[in-house]
Regions:
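A short glycine-rich, Lys/Arg-flanked "PGG" loop and its adjoining helix->strand segment in the class I
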Residues: 101-115
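Conserved Class I S-adenosyl-L-methionine
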Residues: 44, 159-215
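Short, glycine-/aromatic-enriched active-site segment of Class I SAM-dependent methyltransferases
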Residues: 120-138
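Class I SAM-dependent methyltransferase SAM/SAH-binding core
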Residues: 38-77
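Short catalytic micro-motifs in class I SAM-dependent methyltransferases
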Residues: 92-93
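A conserved beta-strand element that flanks and buttresses the S-adenosyl-L-methionine
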Residues: 89
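Short alpha-helix
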Residues: 140-155
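Conserved class I S-adenosyl-L-methionine
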Residues: 1-33, 46-50, 165, 171-174
Length: 215
């Protein structure tokens, strides 16, 4: 799978949909006061970039070497000691994880204080089919309740949750994952009810979790 992401690396680095966003601003806001951070599944490196601009010492991590991370490793097996970073963040990547529960537990393990996650919300099976057809590396989006359970199971207390509508341009969304021909037409059919002009309405969730301390 990493070879697929190596091929997509430049598209994600230059993607307007990934370079900016309310969730990106929120992750930076929530990390105020932290000194060190880990950006899990960094992709185009946008969280790492914004964290560095905010003055944090950042390590970026991704399973695909083509994304040019500081460390090449999967989210489910982070090569760091417990409590290595003040904050661990993961933006719009968890829906690709084969074992999201293990990944959240790993993020909590290497975090000293905070785990911050943003991702697209589960919007029904039709939306899931559209995501899988558009991008076969898609595993699943999760509901707010599922995210809260994942955080709790990793020893994280959810302090803040923010959800919002995140519109993305349809055709660049398809192109970014190499979706063409009949597959692209099928996706257009599946998302027809979520279109506002040339944009698809996605729902996004951001969660701020604080690591529990004994006692």
């Amino acid at each position: 799978m990493s070879s697929v992401w190596d091929e997509r690396a430049e598209a994600y680095r230059t993607s307007e949909a990934h370079r900016e966003g309310k969730d990106l601003d929120l992750l930076v806001e929530w990390s105020q006061g932290a000194k060190t951070a880990l950006d899990v599944a960094t992709g185009g490196g946008h969280v790492a970039r914004r964290f560095r601009e905010a003055g944090l010492e950042v390590v970026s991590l991704d399973p695909a070497a083509g994304m040019q991370p500081d460390v090449v490793a999967p989210a489910e097996s982070l090569p760091f000691d417990e409590g290595s970073f003040d904050v661990v963040a993961c933006r719009v990547a968890a829906h690709h994880f084969e074992d999201v529960r293990a990944a959240v537990k790993e993020m909590a393990r290497v975090a000293r204080d905070l785990v911050l996650v943003s991702d697209n919300l589960f919007a029904g099976e039709e939306a899931e089919e559209a995501d899988r057809v558009r991008d076969p590396s898609h595993v699943r989006n999760y509901t707010e309740e599922e995210w809260r359970s994942l955080f709790a199971g990793a020893g994280l207390d959810v302090e803040q949750v923010h959800t919002y509508v995140h519109p993305v341009l349809l055709e660049p969304w398809l192109k970014r994952s190499g979706c063409t021909g009949k597959d692209a037409e099928r996706v257009r059919q599946l998302v027809a009810g979520r279109l506002d002009g040339d944009r698809v309405r996605l729902e996004r969730i951001c969660l701020k979790g604080r690591k529990r301390t004994d006692g």
